Swiss-Prot record:
This is Putative ESX-1 scaffolding and assembly protein SaeC. May be involved in assembly of the ESX-1 / type VII specialized secretion system (T7SS), which exports several proteins including EsxA and EsxB. Involved in DNA conjugation in recipient (MKD8) strain. Disruption phenotype: Secretes greatly reduced amounts of EsxB, protein is synthesized intracellularly. In single deletion mutant EccCb1 only rarely localizes near the cell pole, while disruption of the probable saeA-saeB-saeC operon completely blocks polar localization of EccCb1. Loss of DNA conjugation when disrupted in recipient strain (MKD8). Keywords: Cytoplasm. GO terms for cellular component: cytoplasm. It is found in: Cytoplasm. The keyword ATP-binding does not apply. DNA conjugation in M.smegmatis is unidirectional with distinct donor and recipient strains; mc(2)155 is a donor strain while MKD8 is a recipient strain. Mutations in a donor strain that alter DNA transfer do not always alter DNA transfer in a recipient strain.
Length: 385
């Protein structure tokens, strides 16, 4: 059973809904459902619905039946949020990931680099990773690829749900090819740090958290003053902003409830911590010079996700978080106030490999580190990647 790429709700095989796209012309109606879930005014054409009758075990009607009823080429939409479903979406399997973190944790940079790394990984497996829609291709190119890979600069912060343009509202949908006889899709949804810090996460635009297969919570080590102080002379000047990651994590866990997705706790911008190797006489310098540590090795491009390495890394990152005064984050994950502990794992990633200089990339370019680890932890459970 696949999921809607916007609300992440499992698509009910007993309920189908079609409408006419805007380009078909004809009367348009304000769509209160789509407006609520997108956070922006939306309209739709006339609707055609089908619900399975008691005792009927046959297939649902084809789209051609809706086309005849609506007298124009119909498109299928999600019965819950009215998002237009790509052709063949129900027949595939969508793995849905939500990304969360305070402002300036590097979520957008991570997405930009992650897609490139996944393309290379899929190529190694002999499958092609492609955008599912032109909307995804355009959104990725405009919001992620061009600022980072073409302009060689950093990516602007993700707009809030109330200020987003249409290409920011578009979930990023990618086809991962055929695995075990089923077409697999990967859906990525990024949420503005400002929304995570102070938004109403019970509102319809954020209900996808409860239905996600996994939530990636990203934590920036530069939020720790003792780390910033030790790196003062080693790194270019950094703009430190964003809310308290503990508050954001609490909000994330509230938004997730009552769902039970996997939770990846990701120490982002790990290149910052690796720079501590050059701090002479520092405890952190010794920690970051441990050549046997899993957090200094990148095994993420192996033939399959290395569960043993993943568990070792999990424990090492747990220790790092304690040293980073992140005990409250670990407590929220391991003993949450909701009373429901999610399956979780700790990771380190570096999207760039080297700290940027202001708003420009480091002269050495982009050197990603362990970026696909969290994704492979999730997809390997489905026999993918």
């Amino acid at each position: 059973m696949s999921k809607c790429p916007r609300c992440f709700t499992a698509l009910n095989p007993n309920q189908y809904l079609w409408t006419l796209p805007e380009q078909s012309g004809g009367t348009r109606y304000r769509d209160e459902v789509a407006t609520a879930y997108s956070g922006a005014p939306a309209d739709c054409g006339p609707l055609y619905t089908w619900s399975r009758s008691p005792g009927y075990n046959g297939p649902p009607p084809p789209t051609s039946e809706a086309t005849r009823a609506l007298q124009a080429p119909a498109v299928e939409i999600c019965p819950v949020c009215h998002f237009t479903l790509p052709e063949g979406w129900r027949e595939g399997h969508a793995i849905c990931i939500a990304l969360a973190g305070a402002r300036a944790t590097g979520k957008s940079l991570y997405i930009a680099v992650l897609v490139k790394q996944l393309e290379l990984l899929c190529e190694r497996f002999g499958v092609s990773m492609q955008p599912v829609t032109r909307g995804t291709a355009q959104a990725y190119a405009t919001n992620y690829e061009t600022p980072l890979y073409v302009q060689r600069g950093l990516i602007p912060p993700t707009p809030t749900v109330r200020t987003q343009t249409s290409d920011h509202r578009e979930p990023l949908m990618f086809s991962l090819g055929i695995w075990h006889g089923v077409r697999r899709f990967l859906v990525l949804r990024d949420v503005a740090g400002e929304d995570m810090e102070s938004g109403d996460l019970h509102a319809p635009p954020f209900r996808f958290f409860a239905h996600a297969d996994a939530v990636f919570f990203m934590f920036d080590p530069l939020r720790v003053k003792t780390i910033r102080d030790q790196l003062h002379d080693l790194l270019p000047a950094q703009v430190v902003s964003g809310g308290d990651p503990r508050t954001v994590l609490t909000n994330v866990l509230t938004a997730v409830s009552p769902g039970q997705p996997k939770l990846a706790v990701i120490l982002s911008k790990f290149d910052v911590l690796r720079a501590l190797r050059d701090v002479e006489g520092s405890e952190w310098g010794l920690i970051m010079s441990n050549g046997g540590a899993a957090y200094l090795r990148d095994t993420s491009d192996g033939q399959q996700y290395d569960e043993t390495d993943g568990q070792l890394l999990h424990e090492e990152v747990r220790s790092l978080l304690l040293r980073l005064h992140g005990g409250s984050i670990l407590a929220a994950v391991e003993n949450p106030a909701t009373g429901v502990r999610l399956q979780s794992r700790n990771f380190v990633v570096s999207a760039l490999g080297h700290p940027p200089s202001g708003n420009r990339l480091h002269a050495r370019g982009i050197a990603p580190f362990r970026c696909v680890d969290p994704i492979r932890w999730v997809t390997s459970g489905f026999g993918v990647l």
